[in-house]
A protein has these predicted regions:
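Short catalytic/metal-binding and nucleic-acid-binding patches
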Residues: 1-121
């Protein structure tokens, strides 16, 4: 649970799969850079070994493989569907037993003082 991401994305200019691909590319490069250069990650060598190992078996990766290749892009056609998906996403850490209430998960828009800010629907 703590190693996956759920997003609700809307774009008026580009297909969401293109935006998501760019997001994954950019974040992978930045996170790998922080891991490689950082002194705070104690598991640095192990993590880089795992990313290198998985890159060996993927045809479109050079040195590291960070994100899974499969994306589950689900169109949300109605406001009701959007609200259902938000409720589902907020409840994931509760179902995983990481918190007792959705608002306790600090990496969620359900948190009282979220680090992630949602645009109005």
């Amino acid at each position: 649970m703590s190693n996956c991401i759920h997003l609700i994305v809307k774009s008026k200019t580009e297909p969401v799969n293109i935006i998501f691909g760019r997001f994954k590319s950019y974040t992978a490069k930045e996170i790998l850079h922080v891991i490689e250069e950082g002194v705070y990650e104690k598991r640095k060598d192990w993590m880089l070994l795992v990313f290198r190992y998985h890159a060996k078996y993927k045809t479109n990766y050079d040195e590291f493989h960070f994100w899974d290749s499969d994306n589950q892009l689900i169109p949300l056609e109605t406001l009701e569907a959007i609200h259902e998906k938000i409720a589902f996403i907020h409840n994931i850490p509760v179902e995983a037993g990481l918190v007792s209430q959705a608002s306790h998960w600090v990496f969620s828009s359900a948190h009282n003082q979220p680090t992630l800010i949602m645009d109005a629907l």
